[in-house]
Amino acid sequence: MNHAITMGIFWHLIGAASAACFYAPFKKVKHWSWETMWSVGGIVSWLILPWAISATLLPDFWAYYRSFNASTLLPVFLFGAMWGIGNINYGLTMRYLGMSMGIGIAIGITLIVGTLMTPIINGQFSVLMHTQGGQMTLLGVLVAVIGVGIVTRAGQLKERKMGIKAEEFNLKKGLLLAVMCGIFSAGMSFAMNAAKPMHDAAAALGVDPLYAALPSYVVIMGGGALVNLGFCFIRLAKVKNLSVKADFSLAKPLIISNLLLSALGGLMWYLQFFFYAWGHASIPAQYDYMSWMLHMSFYVLCGGLVGLVLKEWNNAGRRPVSVLSLGCVVIIIAANIVGLGMAS
């Protein structure tokens, strides 16, 4: 496995670790509605940071975006909005299926759809099926899905042991939402594929290849922001017990604390895709579709490890922790299989 591929896998791991931790600051926000908190974090992660970093990287910010026609920008924006719909469905999936089953089904589906649909759309799938490297990377996807399934099983054992149940368990509704969440969340992978002309244009302007994908986030995350912020603003306007005015009528120190914590959560959310761009740039072009598989499987891996560090599994017993450990090992094996496949 060469150095570039190793670093690509490493950067995806760092990005996934940030994704697994980003909600921790949000949990410390007090006396704010989820909608206000999520909006503040979202404005930082989907609007301020993509625009600020792109303005820093590009020699002429507006000229860069004006150089693309609508046929290039619209699919990128719409795939970003597609991801935004999946993001909203994610929370509803947890509500009706519980954390473990919801995460397992939604992440498993988005891993498969987001990874495999890209080479199918690009007409590369048959080539992958008939080359040694392609076969190994596809095997890595299968092993990763198995690893996600094992971690999901560990979560179910933990929830059963600790008496944790879904807020409003509804298998039929939950499964439908999990499938929708898995498919729509893959929009981020499709958006990155559609944004390749934007990446190439940024590189042609002298932007370092590691950063070349970042200017496309203005459009991708703009689509996601439209859906997420629209959802939050509509609820804040229509739901009687939600009030932005009330949220900002708290004591000034608490408002400042909530703003900083929400902004920190937004920063950590953005960093997952900052490092995703680095990992994506380090992987051979013919295997760039594997970025999504690495990100999502490492997300599950890091989520399990973060749970152990935060002692969320302390009262779960030995068996759930053993199953979790096995799942984490399987995901690590999957990443190595993918790395060897890309290097062959």
UniProtKB/Swiss-Prot annotation:
<keyword id="KW-1133">Transmembrane helix</keyword>
<keyword id="KW-0813">Transport</keyword>
<comment type="similarity">
    <text>Belongs to the L-rhamnose transporter (TC 2.A.7.6) family.</text>
</comment>
<dbReference type="GO" id="GO:0015153">
    <property type="term" value="F:rhamnose transmembrane transporter activity"/>
</dbReference>
<feature type="transmembrane region" description="Helical">
    <location>
        <begin position="290"/>
        <end position="310"/>
    </location>
</feature>
<feature type="transmembrane region" description="Helical">
    <location>
        <begin position="4"/>
        <end position="24"/>
    </location>
</feature>
<feature type="transmembrane region" description="Helical">
    <location>
        <begin position="175"/>
        <end position="195"/>
    </location>
</feature>
<dbReference type="GO" id="GO:0015293">
    <property type="term" value="F:symporter activity"/>
</dbReference>
<dbReference type="InterPro" id="IPR004673">
    <property type="entry name" value="L-rhamnose-proton_sym_RhaT"/>
</dbReference>
<keyword id="KW-0997">Cell inner membrane</keyword>
<keyword id="KW-0472">Membrane</keyword>
<feature type="transmembrane region" description="Helical">
    <location>
        <begin position="323"/>
        <end position="343"/>
    </location>
</feature>
<comment type="function">
    <text>Uptake of L-rhamnose across the cytoplasmic membrane with the concomitant transport of protons into the cell (symport system).</text>
</comment>
<keyword id="KW-0769">Symport</keyword>
<protein>
    <recommendedName>
        <fullName>L-rhamnose-proton symporter</fullName>
    </recommendedName>
</protein>
<dbReference type="Pfam" id="PF06379">
    <property type="entry name" value="RhaT"/>
</dbReference>
<feature type="transmembrane region" description="Helical">
    <location>
        <begin position="214"/>
        <end position="234"/>
    </location>
</feature>
<keyword id="KW-0812">Transmembrane</keyword>
<feature type="transmembrane region" description="Helical">
    <location>
        <begin position="131"/>
        <end position="151"/>
    </location>
</feature>
<feature type="transmembrane region" description="Helical">
    <location>
        <begin position="259"/>
        <end position="279"/>
    </location>
</feature>
<feature type="transmembrane region" description="Helical">
    <location>
        <begin position="38"/>
        <end position="58"/>
    </location>
</feature>
<feature type="transmembrane region" description="Helical">
    <location>
        <begin position="72"/>
        <end position="92"/>
    </location>
</feature>
<keyword id="KW-1003">Cell membrane</keyword>
<feature type="transmembrane region" description="Helical">
    <location>
        <begin position="101"/>
        <end position="121"/>
    </location>
</feature>
<keyword id="KW-0762">Sugar transport</keyword>
<dbReference type="GO" id="GO:0005886">
    <property type="term" value="C:plasma membrane"/>
</dbReference>
